[in-house]
């Protein structure tokens, strides 16, 4: 554990973050935009938003799936379909009253 004076921690210190798979990270997290075409590709640097998140103390836990090519390639594939992650599901629980 790290102990620092109150107010000396960065704004997002230790906050876990999931990034969509189209946001570049220069680490072991693939940036594929949901496509096999980019599997294993290496980006030269973190995206600007990732640099700012890391500087603010956020912890990148992983990548969240998205429709292949951000659903740009076709209107025929089902919403949420990704070659890497399959069909996306809702990430919330719907309660019935």
Which stretches of residues belong to each language-model region?
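Gly/Ser-rich catalytic/binding loops embedded in alpha/beta enzyme cores
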Residues: 1-97
């Amino acid at each position: 554990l790290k102990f620092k004076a109150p107010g000396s921690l960065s704004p997002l210190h230790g906050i876990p973050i999931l990034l969509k798979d189209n946001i570049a990270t220069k680490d072991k997290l693939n940036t594929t935009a949901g496509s096999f075409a980019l599997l294993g590709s290496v980006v030269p640097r973190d995206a600007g938003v990732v640099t700012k998140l890391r500087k603010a103390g956020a912890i990148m836990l992983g990548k969240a799936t998205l429709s292949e090519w951000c659903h740009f390639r076709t209107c025929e594939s089902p919403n949420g379909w990704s070659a890497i992650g399959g069909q996306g599901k809702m990430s919330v629980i719907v309660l019935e009253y």
